Amino acid sequence: MKMVVEKTEKFDPEEVIEEFEVLTKDAGKIQEETLQKILEENGGTEYLQQWGLNGKTDSLSFKNCIPIVTHKDLEPYIHRIADGDLSPILTGKPITTISLSSGTTQGKPKFVPFNEELMESTMQIFKTSFVFRNREFPVVNGKALQFIYGSKQFKTKGGLAAGTATTNVYRNAQFKKTMKAMQTPCCSPDEVIFGPDFQQSLYCHLLCGLIFRDEVQVVSSTFAHSIVHAFRNFEQIWQELVTNIREGVLSSRVIVPSMRAAMSKLLKPDPELADTIFNKCSRLSNWYGLIPELFPNTRYIYGIMTGSMEPYLKKLRHYAGDLPLLSADYGSSEGWIGANVNPELPPELVTYAVLPNIGYFEFIPLMENLDGLEPMPVGLTEVKLGEEYEIVVTNFAGLYRYRLGDVVKIKGFHNGTPELQFICRRNLLLSINIDKNTEKDLQLAVEAAAKILSDEKLEVVDFTSHVNVSADPGHYVIFWELNGEASEEILKECCNCLDKSFVDAGYVGSRKVHAIGALELRIVKRGTFHKILDHFVGLGAAVSQFKTPRCVGPTNLSVLQILSSNVVESYFSTAFC
């Protein structure tokens, strides 16, 4: 059963909820039907034929024939498609668009097939979470201040349109129709969203938000990082924005002709609005509650706030004041997994109900068998409450039994479908010896050490890590960018706290016997992490899709170079001396 994307500008919320309830009540049956449909559409492809599926469409034959794979296994097939091979390689119907992952995890963007079925899944997820969100936090005839940035699409060697997953969505006509149907159209014109320069687009987004300040009911972005980044910038440029509004003249920093032309239609002299914004900003204490002061009718802040976005929540709450933070849905460049149908939960507790008709899902239990082999994956309706799994996806765009690399925990069930909590990326491990520390472990260590800074009214702007094995024994390196100057004494204390906060038994044991060297804390110049963002944007990533890499591997030389060349101070832990 596939939800039909409506072509009209209004949709019935009750109908969307009813369809969701029907889908989730019989999740097991819907999963079998979804797999059958995927295999019927693509049974004649080179990939499925080579594994001897021979037109079978049942799940047992599928699992017996088709291996579990990573992106590396499918890369040669995807590159042939991108290079113009029109034969049915992964899908029966030709792939016309390629999505690029952000590339922040592995250091370079991955190519992923994108098609109209994935676009339909996107709109289904958006609508489903919206109707649940709108029951709790209704918005009516408002606008959304969306910090979204559509990078340029380009043509692959074979003439396919290629762009980041977010760009492919934003450029699709269905996206704008759906936003309009949700009564939260973006307050920025397309010329700003698709502008060629991120800093100029950000400036115009903020200006559009201020012009429509009374109509803004939602402040959002793909990721929480982009919202925090936008308002950190606002702190620096707010007086210039006020002057633009007072005089009705756009700043000379915006030089893209199409952007200037679009903004000139919106910007008119408004001294009264300029005075209001000036007075509100002048009265704020350390910018606390900035968002509701600027946009008084805002109902909530919306974006992906889990995983690598959690470290930005403290600053986001500072800007949001009493406004609720609502975490957006769960997906990746490869496709969507689930919708947030419990919007009242804070980001730290948010769960995602898997939509059983947008793909076929399997779950690898995160425990080794006694013989050391990885356990067999289980189906969507076979997962157990409280257990952790890695997700395996089969979708309508040519990915079959594809390891997503995400670790999730089963927190409950909505009818027959599980509600997942995102835990971490499985492959983001700090490991030298027998130690194994995940992104979550790193995050907890940074949070513990950052509490020492907060007493000094300082904060960690951003952070990442690296395993240095150039010397023996190897050691962990943590890079911090701070919002001010910290004393040597404080930073030494932070360094020791970081080292002691990794509580993994393998790490602690290895540190005690000096099989792992002392943890190193390196402080980098202000703006270093912005240089990393610029680097990935230069590679073709969209700002809206950017995630700071939490662990920089040895092959990610460009990012290591940016970090290393901007180090201003370095400290080694004395915790295990």
Swiss-Prot record:
Keywords: ATP-binding, Jasmonic acid signaling pathway, Ligase, Nucleotide-binding, Plant defense. GO terms for biological process: defense response. Pfam families: GH3, GH3_C, GH3_M. Its EC number is 6.3.2.52. Jasmonate binds at residues 102, 328-331. The keyword ATP-binding applies. It catalyses: a jasmonate + an L-alpha-amino acid + ATP = a jasmonyl-L-amino acid + AMP + diphosphate + H(+). InterPro entries: GH3, GH3_C, GH3_M. It comes from the Eukaryota. Induction: Induced by wounding. Induced by oral secretion of the herbivore Manduca sexta caterpillars. Induced by treatment with JA-Ile. Belongs to the IAA-amido conjugating enzyme family. This is Jasmonoyl--L-amino acid synthetase JAR4. It comes from Nicotiana attenuata (Coyote tobacco).
